[in-house]
Amino acid sequence: MMIWDWNLSKPSESIKKHSGTWDKGIDYKQTYKMFKEDLQKLKNKELLYEDDYKRIAYLITFLFQLRNGCRIWEAIAGMINIAINIDNLNWNERITVKVRTQKRKDWEFRELIIPKCIKKEDIEMVRDVFLDIKKEIDEKLTMDEKLKAKKKIVKRFGAWLYKNYGINTHSLRYAYVTYLGEHGIPAQVLAKITKHKNINYIETYTQSRLAKEILKNIGDLDD
């Protein structure tokens, strides 16, 4: 399978630590259902404008990100790889795609799986949207230009999500982490799934979320 990314040479991006203000505490199941229903509504109507196809492409990408607990660029790169390999994939089985893990200095790839609700015909409908995104990167000549184009694309996706849903892309990643933590998945396994290098961070995050839920839901004797 052909693997594409903006940069497949040795990673050199610096790792930035997040302060935690990005985490909006969104619910995984509610968000998944919301994206899925909005996607279906779009598919059921007559698509007249280019923005309709872009909206479908964006919703597919965010469903993809949410389902895998990945970073937004990993989801975008994953969708591009699916688009360019669409006819070489076995759509009778669950589709997985490899992408380069972002924010890592080591040479690390991860597998992402397409949500069951996303079908081949959905990708075919918006394939050109993802190929155009790929072209935005490929037409740049230097690595600095490619990096700037990548950041611009990520910003565009993030702005669209915030404008339409009031949430940020990183919250989708941690909604999945929280969801798996609620199902008793150990921090070590969570780190492997989401490609977090810092297991202690995952432990602290999931324990903090659990502590908030316990404080909120356990102790009242008024009912």
Curated annotation (Swiss-Prot):
Q: Name one GO biological process term.
A: chromosome segregation
Top-level division of the source organism's lineage: Archaea
Q: Which residues form the Tyr recombinase domain?
A: 29-220
Question: Which residues does the Swiss-Prot or TrEMBL record annotate as the active site?
Answer: 71, 103, 170, 173, 196, 205 (o-(3'-phospho-dna)-tyrosine intermediate)
Q: GO: which molecular function terms?
A: DNA binding; site-specific recombinase activity
Native organism:
Methanocaldococcus jannaschii (strain ATCC 43067 / DSM 2661 / JAL-1 / JCM 10045 / NBRC 100440)
Record-given protein name: Uncharacterized protein MJ0770
Q: Which UniProt keywords apply?
A: DNA recombination
Key word Nuclease present: no
The residues that cross the membrane are none
Which InterPro entries does the annotation name?
DNA_brk_join_enz, Integrase-like_cat_sf, Integrase_catalytic
The family note in this entry says: Belongs to the 'phage' integrase family.
Q: Which PROSITE patterns match?
A: TYR_RECOMBINASE
